[in-house]
A protein has these predicted regions:
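Conserved helix-loop functional segments at active or binding sites
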Residues: 330, 334-341, 367, 396, ...
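Long, K/E/R/D-enriched contiguous segments that form extended
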Residues: 296-334, 340-341, 348-351, 399, ...
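Short pre-active-site segment immediately N-terminal to the catalytic Zn-binding motif
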Residues: 317-319, 369-391
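C-terminal, non-catalytic "cap/extension" segments appended to globular domains
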Residues: 11-13, 114, 118-121, 141-148, ...
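Catalytic zinc-binding patch centered on the HExxH motif and its immediate surroundings
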Residues: 317-319, 352-372
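Short beta-alpha connecting loops at secondary-structure transitions
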Residues: 375-379, 406-416, 446-453, 472-474, ...
């Protein structure tokens, strides 16, 4: 498949490998009509201002109108953003996406009175409304979530002031983004033959994966030389972000920034502590893996820039798309007929946009809305990684399909805390199937990639989570949060996580300054918890069979956001308030490490 086709050529020559957006709107004219319809309905909310608490029926009508309009708007936006992503050079669709985005902002602004007005109603009165008016049952859980925020909502004038201040408070994050992505320039990386290679944020990891150790070291040194030259500035920027989080938490009557951040998804704080504590217990496994890496690379000293280069090289593993579909369907057979039928529907009904074309957005994702099919964007290049992306994105898409089919629109979106569970569970099922059906040479390649996935997701993201909590705790204790202190704390964590087999130095102590996740307010821990939950659920599916599959589909995939995410996972068979899922994930890592060592010595 040519990667140089224009979008029009791609759709004309290979329509079966493009997504079918006519299932959303027949054509652009239908999109414009739907856009106009939503636009014209803005203003209807005025009838409810000052009257939300008048009666149960009024409350229901307001919630229903907001939900209905929001759902229509979501459909409009999804069409525009998918059209833009299939060809980012097309000004027409860039304009459509921009207009749809602006309409979302207008909609949000128009309805911003709703939650504050609900909070002006006495909690008992809301409960009596729900009990006496059956239609309100649809929104009972939403109202419960709003009620739980009461101790943390201030008077309307103060909330308005704080909302207006958020733009200014976002300055640290905005400054970091512009500095890191736009202003920062790296010296070229030099390879063993003295050739210069342009070094950017995009090429950095590629060079760290190189066989050429001189190129790896040069890339590593030059990146941290650039960040290190601005250590004081970046320290002040991150400290500003931490101060913002602490300020927002304290002004809303939370004890800590973490308590506020986790309360958004009703996650108990012990889930966070439990993750860190349990991963600490299994760090000797990570040390064993890094020691093995040192041995297999034949190095006297393993440096941080040696951690990314593959241990298994020169094994070709081509994966054409048609073959990948077969691998996926076989790997997902343990999920049963109901699940497989959804995947087959997606493959047969053009949910997937497979190949690259001129102007197409890079990467891969799953998108969609309550009133549309799920849609998957890929840029297929016949690699094993592409197969994993396909399986991963179908995990998201099947989750979305079941949630939207079995939940009303107001509870069909699942939370960030569980978002990566379904996708990563599919990856684990694929790994299990491939491990049983590949020859030893390709198994080695696969195991190497899986061990790296564990290192990068479970261990590394937990280390990030530990650092993030540490710097917030320093600020909350009243101690000065300086760049020097950040370097020291990060150095301690690198030593703890990587042990004696990896030599750390001053450069890696500044790695915190290039990690954008530290500007995402207690987001990063969810990569590790989601990964652990997925490993646990896939283990149950493979060992228990149908009972585990039924729990997974009925109690997790079909539940959307109809309950707290912790409870949804618990009902599916994973209790993230206990160490068990993290322990199971670490034990899977150990099994894969054992298998890898055994094959290497065979």
């Amino acid at each position: 498949m040519s990667q140089q086709l224009s979008r029009e050529e791609q759709e004309r020559k290979y329509p079966e490998y493009t997504w079918d957006l006519t299932t959303i709107f027949k054509d652009d004219e239908a999109f414009e009509a739907a856009f106009k319809e939503v636009e014209n309905e803005l203003g209807k909310e005025e009838q409810f201002k000052g009257h939300i608490g008048d009666s149960a029926e009024t409350l229901y009508n307001a919630l229903e109108l907001e939900d209905t309009l929001g759902t229509k708007l979501e459909k409009v936006y999804v069409y525009a953003h998918l059209k833009q992503d299939q060809d980012t050079t097309n000004d027409k669709y860039t304009g459509m996406e921009s207009r749809a985005h602006q309409l979302i902002i207008k909609f949000s602004s128009a309805w911003s009175f709703l939650v504050p007005e609900i909070l002006q109603i006495d909690e008992d009165k809301i409960q009596s409304f729900v009990n006496s008016y059956d239609k309100l049952q649809k929104f009972a859980f939403d109202l419960k979530l709003i009620n739980e925020k009461r101790p943390h909502i201030l008077d309307a004038e103060t909330e308005k002031l704080l909302t207006e201040a958020q733009d200014a408070l976002s300055t640290p994050s905005n400054v970091y983004g512009m500095f890191s992505n736009a202003d920062l320039v790296f010296e070229d990386a030099i390879d063993k033959d003295g050739n210069a290679h342009p070094l950017t944020q995009g090429t950095f990891i590629k060079y760290l994966e190189s066989d050429d150790r001189k190129l790896r070291e040069s890339a590593f040194r030059n990146v941290y030389k650039a960040y290190g030259a601005h250590n004081n500035t970046l320290g002040a920027t991150l400290a500003g972000e931490v101060k913002k989080n602490v300020f927002n938490a304290r002004t809303h009557n939370y004890k800590t920034a973490r308590e506020k951040a986790l309360s958004n998804n009703h996650i108990p704080e012990n889930v966070y502590d439990n993750l860190v504590k349990t991963v600490h217990k299994y760090l000797p496994l990570l040390h064993r893996y890094t020691e093995l890496r040192k041995e297999l690379l034949g190095l006297d000293d393993l440096k941080m820039y040696d951690l990314y280069t593959p241990l298994i090289k020169d094994i070709k593993f081509e994966m054409p798309y048609e073959e990948a579909k077969e691998w996926m369907l076989k790997a997902l057979e343990p999920m049963g007929e109901e699940y497989l039928n959804v995947v087959k529907e997606g493959l047969n009904n053009r949910w997937v946009d497979v190949y690259e074309n001129k102007g197409k957005r890079s990467g891969g994702y799953s998108s969609g809305a309550h009133l549309t099919n799920p849609f998957i964007l890929l840029n297929w290049s016949n690699t094993i990684s592409d197969l994993y992306t396909l399986v991963h994105e179908f995990g998201h898409s099947a989750h979305s399909y079941f949630s939207r089919k079995f939940q009303p629109s107001n509870s069909s979106d699942y939370t960030i805390f569980v978002a990566e569970v379904a996708s990563t569970c599919n990856e684990a099922l694929l790994s299990d199937y491939m491990d049983k059906h590949l020859d030893d040479e390709k198994r080695l390649l696969l195991l190497n990639q899986e061990l790296e996935r564990f290192r990068a997701t479970l261990f590394r993201q937990t280390m990030f989570a530990e650092f993030e909590h540490k710097i917030h705790a320093i600020e909350e204790s009243g101690e000065p949060l300086t760049p020097t202190r950040m370097n020291e704390e990060y150095a301690k964590l690198n030593k703890l996580y990587f042990g004696d087999s990896v030599e750390t130095d001053e450069d890696i102590n500044k790695e915190w300054s290039r990690i954008p996740h530290f500007y995402m307010n207690y987001y990063v821990y969810q990569y590790a918890t989601g990964y652990s939950a997925a490993q646990s659920l896939s283990h149950q599916i493979l060992t228990e069979g149908k009972p585990a599959v039924d729990r997974y589909i009925n109690e997790f995939l079909k539940k959307g956001s109809s309950n707290y995410p912790i409870e949804i996972l618990k009902n599916a068979g994973v209790d993230m308030t206990t160490p068990e899922p993290i322990e199971q994930a670490c034990e899977v890592f150990e099994q894969k490490l054992n298998a890898f060592e055994k094959l290497m010595k065979a």
